[in-house]
Amino acid sequence: MTDKTSNQMWGGRFAAGPDAIMEAINASIGFDKRLAAQDIAGSRAHAAMLAATGVITDSDAEAIREGLLTVLSEIEAGEFTFSTALEDIHMNVEARLKEIIGEPAGRLHTARSRNDQVATDFKLWVRDQFDAAEAGLLALLRALLGQAEAGADWVMPGFTHLQTAQPVTWGHHMMAYVEMFGRDLSRVRDARARMNESPLGSAALAGTSFPIDRHMTAAALGFDRPTANSLDAVSDRDFALEFLSVASICAMHLSRFAEELVIWSSAQFRFVTLSDRFSTGSSIMPQKKNPDAAELIRAKVGRIFGANTALMMVMKGLPLAYSKDMQEDKEQVFDAADNWMLALAAMEGMVRDMTANRDSLAAAAGSGFSTATDLADWLVRVLGLPFRDAHHVTGALVALAESKGCDLPDLSLDEMQSAHAAITEDVYGVLGVENSVNSRQSYGGTAPAQVRAQVARWKEMLA
């Protein structure tokens, strides 16, 4: 296939070919060649429909079908020469098709515009990426459930402001991420369902006078229905924006978890040990084992956020219907999708392979006066104090323990009673971290029984 000096697909009204700079800024084949399989699938469905409705002959449709299969095989084998003079994947495919089958190739674009063609191609590609994201999220959720089930009763500190707050369990913390990524899964499925309408047959913007069957092409391409308004169909990039929005929310969750894994795997915490398979070393410091996968997830999230913002900026000022600005939609989505899928896979691998250090978790669980709230609750429940009074008494005891360099359970009964005379020996029963987590039996709480129930619920949902 040879480069063309002028575009034979639209050049009839032009006296000269485009300037080299115009050709460079106008061409998108450098990136939209990723849509080749989707473009050919859409063209095959369109040709079959044109034959079924009598717009083209069966013999032309068959020639087009066979020719498109040849083009696809050339692309997949790396034997296809892409031309910047032909601008985009649509014209590159059609030009090569003409070289293979001749005149029937010119009938393929009947009742179709590149406007509905690219919208269809892009939707098909984004739909595939939603499916890939669903698979990645399911794998990650199952890895998290495995961690949660194994550590349903392993105590660890819960944090607010990255300061010790209350004891929780490892399983409870893992289930928090199950809930987050579970919402991401729901958003993926919801957005995929909403976008599954076919733009094909909308033509440039107003539809077509040919007797086409848009329901036929929609069904052939796996869409639920054709779009209801041709003008909207070619103007719409909501599906791409929603993809990026869903990806951004999920990426934010990935980044938060990645940050915790970086902290937890440090020598100062030792909460988790990341496997060698998801760590790297240092070129100068032999002792180093760096959580680079987690750090790179955290960084790649910025690219996903940037893509979301960039496409919003592209679309914000465009009148209906198509404007060439919309050519700038794809690179953002391609890059975000690549990084999202990679981040999901890396996180799933880290979670699956990592080891939670139960002893380190338990040692940290009781530090920082983590059972102070349990003491305040005991004062309310047993002594009948108003919670604000109980809060004040407990704060005084924390200050006393801090001044002595000890934890709350290390205070003597006399010292306890110095803050409130009615405190009894029974108070020590609520100051242990195991008792604390076991007492949190409210629905969704950190008690091991609650954690196991939530694990079972999610396993059933994902079965």
From Swiss-Prot:
**UniProt KW keywords:** Amino-acid biosynthesis, Arginine biosynthesis, Cytoplasm, Lyase
Q: From which domain of life does this come?
A: Bacteria
- Gene3D superfamilies recorded for this chain? Fumarase/aspartase (C-terminal domain) (1.10.40.30), Fumarase/aspartase (Central domain) (1.20.200.10), Fumarase/aspartase (N-terminal domain) (1.10.275.10)
Task: Give its E.C. classification number.
Answer: 4.3.2.1
Which terms in the Gene Ontology molecular function aspect does this entry carry? argininosuccinate lyase activity
Q: Which PROSITE patterns match?
A: FUMARATE_LYASES
Localization of this protein: Cytoplasm
Note the SS bond partners: none
- Which pathway? Amino-acid biosynthesis; L-arginine biosynthesis; L-arginine from L-ornithine and carbamoyl phosphate: step 3/3
* Record GO biological process: arginine biosynthetic process via ornithine; L-arginine biosynthetic process
UniProt cross-references to Pfam families, sorted A to Z? ASL_C2, Lyase_1
Q: Which GO terms describe its cellular component?
A: cytosol
Q: Top enzyme class of this protein?
A: lyase
Show the SUPFAM superfamilies listed in the entry: L-aspartase-like (SSF48557)
Tell me what reaction this enzyme catalyses.
2-(N(omega)-L-arginino)succinate = fumarate + L-arginine
| Major localisation | cytoplasm
Q: Which NCBIfam families match?
A: argH
Q: Which family does it belong to?
A: Belongs to the lyase 1 family. Argininosuccinate lyase subfamily.
- The protein in question is named Argininosuccinate lyase
The organism encoding this protein is Ruegeria pomeroyi (strain ATCC 700808 / DSM 15171 / DSS-3)
Q: What is the lineage of its organism?
A: Bacteria, Pseudomonadati, Pseudomonadota, Alphaproteobacteria, Rhodobacterales
Record gene name: argH
